[in-house]
Amino acid sequence: MKTAIIGYPRIGENRELKFAIEKYWKNEITENELLKIAEEIRRNQWLKQKEEKISFIPGNTFSFYDGILDTIILLNAIPKHYRDLGLNELNTYFAIARGYQGEKGDVKALSMRKWYNTNYHYMVPELDDYAKIKLNADKIFSELEEAKKLGVNTHPSVIGPFTFYKLAKTTGNKDKREYLGNIINVYIELLEKCNEKNIEWVQIEEPQLVTDQTEEDIKLFEEVYTEILKNKKDVKVLLQTYFGDVRDCYGTIIELDFDGIGLDFTEGRKTEKLIAENGFPKDKVLFAGVVNGKNIWKCDYRKVLNILNNLKGKAENIVVTTSCSLLHVPYTLRNEEKLTENILKHFSFAEEKLGELRELGELSQILSENSLEKTQENEFYIKNQEIITSKRGMEDKEVRDKVEKLTDNDFVRKGTRKERQRIQREKLNIPLLATTTIGSFPQTKEVKLNRSKFRKNEINKEEYDKNVFNFIKECVKLQEKIGLDVLVHGEYERNDMVEFFGENLAGYVFTEKAWVQSYGTRCVKPPIIFGDVKRTKPISVLYSEYAQKLTEKPVKGMLTGPVTILNWSFPREDVSLSEMAFQIGLAIREEVLDLEKAGIRIIQIDEAALREKLPLRKEDWHKEYLDWGLKAFRLCHSGVKVDTQIHTHMCYSQFEDIIKDIDNMDADVITFEASRSKLTILDFLKENNFETEVGPGVYDIHSPRVPSVEEIVTALDRMIEKIGKDKLWVNPDCGLKTRGIVETVKSLENLVKATEIVKSRL
């Protein structure tokens, strides 16, 4: 049986692309040198996929920054202010992604949002009145030729017009529908060019179809593809979906003239039922997404073969594929030298999933000609089940008992919000329009070297901590000099807001090189929840307590919340998400109470990733996620005194639809990203009478540009107009870890100056 994948990691096995792009940004390598490195990355992954006998290898899945940004280029939908910079093609591309500040102009980046329910971010397309939508497919065809020269047959893969249209926003006076005809024409022309080049298949990805669809949405989808598909000629079109099922529009999809349909059998809870009740067309190929593209556990062949066995007689032509792009998992287990084989055998990264697909392709072929029982006699199946059924260990009865004994009172905080606000203002002496940062400060070469030496056992813990304390001392001095009101210790002891806590919690295991792209060149190395989670010792208390002793101003204790730790880890598949969240919540609760005992009066519990795992179907939001997610957060802070102020922070997300739920987290202050999205959330805060004190980010830290005093004043004026001065905090939109120290200082100085100007008017 044939096999396929939807996409593949593009950062390079050892993050070669990340380092090359960052060198290019610093003018340390040329464009040609960057292109050569990119070509080598593509070469390696194509040859690996060919080696593992993948039948359908997608092209155009490589990107220098983001696939949606590549689609903006494909459609020539570049907003005018980026074109007007007069930069070359590659630098214009990066200006859209990062913003630009230089002799040719000063523009902000496009806004970023989470890619459905993943930790990946995409650039939000903006259609302005000057947009001239037309095909620009040079990248697609050059990469196809590149693969062909290697003896690898690939097919074009593109984000579909329906998804692009739904994710895009307009910034001018034109109605969005005015762009639709030209968008459709681009895809028609793309298929025509593919036909001219005798390309057999084109993969068009439409993940938007797995979200709630209205009748109007379905009508739009049908309109778009009726027009496109009648022009496909000899090209076969694969409609690829992922991240869920297509329950709202399955009937429409199977009636349209697609040649292949890719469905998710991993997260798509109703996919099997849809086929059982409605059938699957005999003239179409079913690309069955049965290998989990999001998680890192070894695939359970028993479950996969059961699905494929159930499809017998319902779908005649099946291709075994992944549930989504392998972009969301690390490259390979080959480079993991510190974990034991007893642990590693349970995992499967991108490269290993190719091997699983090869084995499943063979097993599926056997199954198509034999019974399920006969297929299960195969050596591949037997070896797989030996691993799947083997015990992992790391169970902790004490932790499980604690979770089981939790009562409603464990999730309720002392004092009403109004009482707490009054007491905290008095005790903490917090001024109006208090200025602060989100937590981390730039990770300089010295900070990274200190951590690297410690990890390599070149320095001991005492020397490591001594260096960290020096970094903290300088950070506190710097913040006092700038004039911030509420300080942070800089987080120099942690390389990642989740990995740091995971390293100090029982139940986690850690990799050396299992990097995953979050956005652009930002990569994360998610820890793996391998067993029951508990805190074995204080984690951050030492550093926060030291920082507080250096100043009279309040210093925030900095923690990561249970939902974010869970969402930014690779979770177990043998226990529920709620069970894991409560276990982590109990561990963070212990840390919160220890910080309070150490004299830390403001404690920030970041829930940067709360929104991103919200189920894609609204009917599932509370029962499948928010009901336990909000409780896990409240469990962390319900034991503190009324005069201890609890902060939380959220990163790039759409909050408008869960504003009331965020209020129900019962934090005292929330900070979040707002600058890239042009502060649109302010209206929703006002409409919903949001009670929590709030700090919408006044400038974008994901761009190297320094905000002017004037633009921060303008942002603050707008915030005060919408939500008033009494509940407003002033801060950047995220942590400063990835920024340079010079731009950080300039930006924060401008933030404080702008705040003083606004305060002088009140």
What are these regions (language model features)?
Residues 1-762:
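Domain-level signal for soluble alpha/beta catalytic cores
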